[in-house]
Amino acid sequence: MGRVGLGVAVGCAAVTCAIAAALVARRASARARWRRAVALLREFEEGCATPPARLRQVVDAMVVEMHAGLASDGGSKLKMLLTFVDALPSGSEEGVYYSIDLGGTNFRVLRVQVGAGSVIVNQKVEQQPIPEELTKGTTEGLFNFVALALKNFLEGEDDQDGKMALGFTFSFPVRQISVSSGSLIRWTKGFSIRDTVGRDVAQCLNEALANCGLNVRVTALVNDTVGTLALGHYYDEDTVAAVIIGSGTNACYIERTDAIIKCQGLLTNSGGMVVNMEWGNFWSSHLPRTPYDILLDDETHNRNDQGFEKMISGMYLGEIARLVFHRMAQESDVFGDAADSLSNPFILSTPFLAAIREDDSPDLSEVRRILREHLKIPDAPLKTRRLVVKVCDIVTRRAARLAAAGIVGILKKLGRDGSGAASSGRGRGQPRRTVVAIEGGLYQGYPVFREYLDEALVEILGEEVARNVTLRVTEDGSGVGAALLAAVHSSNRQQQGGPI
């Protein structure tokens, strides 16, 4: 071989070696980036861990906060609001009752006909949007609009003899004064009618109804959680609590009046009262908080509030996963050039998170579609898609298990968790059948979430006690439940309803 040929050969060898070295370096870099993504996943999983021992600590913390909230206003993160609902439907109610459900940009009017034996004979529902200008206008404008809608709804009905009872579900913060009255604390959900704050919203509606010539009055002012409890109790008198787990979350339960220390001397016909916990604001150092939860809290308008809700409700689960993906994109390049799209807050909704977690196809085709179409991440390899599924699973599992701990906290406060003497003072006895009414799209529409919650209940309570606890899905407590409460708390309540 001549010198020229030798030089060419040496040059080719050098180029080949350089290319090989570059490929090796690139593969090593890719492996390092992947290892970083896996490390972030493991770190997140460890931070979200909810072993049974930790869940029991959350249970105990919930009970402590419940006691504190019942002892004094402002003494706990849990508001423990009195509802003045001291009787619940028993299934013996009969007649036709109406309800209005106002809790957002739409409102509903319902006519519910009930028969003895826990039978809903007939139900009619109409939904209407509230014009945006009314959400920022005047009190009279809003309530006159609602009253007129009820008047139009009643036209053609033949059950308008005498004064009619109305249940009013008003899902905004209210300081309850009685079962049929309460003053607005503040507007939420885009409403900003200044002259309503501090006024009795039931009285505002009653005045509007009278102005429309309607012989209708509000006999029960409730929130959606209390309505869910009422509907659950209507079907099953062993129902002692209700939980909503949807875009938001809350719980209420039946408390003995002598345990409500902040209202000494409170008397009811039944000796009990429904307490609205507002448990979304629960907090404890035992909750498994991660750096992503802190980032989420920082980007919300209600910073340092609703800590429990931000861990378990549908409004936030997708965003927690998005924050994890964004950090992975920044530190590992596992998503290629998609870091920009992952920087958009709330781009991943919880329904998409659920669809990702529940994709059981061999190649995770639904995950690939969601990544491509909604997160702008094209051609994610299968191992990346599996990583995405795992993140969504971790978020879901933590949320469901914490929700289960909250439910057990209520049961422990009532002495129904099998731990012996009740915190409310009752002695040890045989396990009693206990029903918790549960409503909300996260529990009803996300089977994996439901399975994790049910599994955690058994882990915390033990199989023997858990056999006596039933979570009963209850639909439309805010509508039908409010109408049933109108029946119980109407002028003929002495013939209807039952002790609680």
From Swiss-Prot:
UniProt keyword list: ATP-binding, Glycolysis, Kinase, Membrane, Mitochondrion, Mitochondrion outer membrane, Nucleotide-binding, Transferase, Transmembrane, Transmembrane helix
Phenotype upon gene inactivation: Decreased grain length, grain width, and grain filling. Delayed seed germination and retarded seedling growth.
Domain of life of the organism encoding this protein: Eukaryota
Binding annotation for ADP: G104, T105, N106, S247, G441
CDD domains, A to Z: ASKHA_NBD_HK_plant
GO MF, one example: ATP binding
Region feature Hexokinase large subdomain, mapped onto this chain: 223-476
Keyword Transferase included in the entry's annotation: yes
GO BP: glycolytic process; hexose metabolic process; intracellular glucose homeostasis
Principal subcellular localization: mitochondrion
Topology within the bilayer: Single-pass membrane protein
Hexokinase small subdomain as annotated region, ranges: 90-222
EC number: 2.7.1.1
Hexokinase domain boundaries: 35-487
Gene Ontology, cellular component aspect: cytosol; mitochondrial outer membrane; mitochondrion
Pfam family, one: Hexokinase_1
Reaction it catalyzes: a D-hexose + ATP = a D-hexose 6-phosphate + ADP + H(+); D-fructose + ATP = D-fructose 6-phosphate + ADP + H(+); D-glucose + ATP = D-glucose 6-phosphate + ADP + H(+)
Described purpose of this protein according to its UniProt entry: Fructose and glucose phosphorylating enzyme. Involved in the regulation of cell expansion in spikelet hulls, grain size, and gibberellin biosynthesis and homeostasis.
Protein name according to UniProt: Hexokinase-3
The gene coding this protein: HXK3
